[in-house]
Design a protein with these regions (language model features):
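Hydrophobic packing positions in regular secondary-structure scaffolds
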Residues: 1-164
């Protein structure tokens, strides 16, 4: 509870405020989550809000949960613009996990970078090596790649262009 997760249907980061459990043969399992924030002074109970199916959400940042829920394959099923929006609202840790999943599909990674706002894109490219930046730019549309090159530091531009 309290950790942010991806609401796949809404393509947004949300917090779980209540968990629904069921007893299975091998122990308790999560069956649903309530992402509705409780009201002040506890007016309205969580029991009054329907829990949504556990499979409608995607854990991020928890390697045990991410692996067992095939996080990478579920993240990559979102549209590039949706992934970019989620990355833009993510914390640094969440951002790193999402970028690692997206990095597994180079074409999707390029599409996501095309959708990021200019400041976020520039910051993320700054953190990569020249070779990584060149590889990413090579898969981007020409106009987006040109804009990204212009956002690079002056001393990196020619090096990256030479690597293309």
């Amino acid at each position: 509870l309290g950790h942010r997760i991806i609401d796949v249907a809404r393509s947004a980061l949300v917090k779980a405020y209540d968990v629904r459990l069921a007893l299975a043969a091998n122990g308790w399992i999560v069956t649903g989550l309530d992402v509705h924030k409780g009201r002040w002074f506890h007016l309205g109970r969580h029991e009054e809000h329907p829990a949504r199916d556990w499979h409608s959400f995607l854990l991020i940042g928890d390697e045990r949960g991410s692996g067992s829920r095939s996080a990478a394959s579920r993240v990559t099923k979102l549209k590039p613009a949706q992934i970019a929006d989620i990355i833009e609202s993510a914390s640094s840790r969440e951002e790193n996990v999402l970028l690692a999943h997206v990095h597994e599909d180079p074409e999707l990674e390029a599409d996501v970078f095309e959708e990021l706002d200019d400041n976020k894109q520039a910051r993320l490219l700054h953190a990569r090596t020249d070779e990584e930046v060149a590889g990413l730019l090579a898969r981007m549309r020409a106009d987006d790649a040109a804009d990204a090159v212009m956002d690079l530091a002056q001393e990196r531009r020619q090096v990256v262009i030479d690597l293309l």
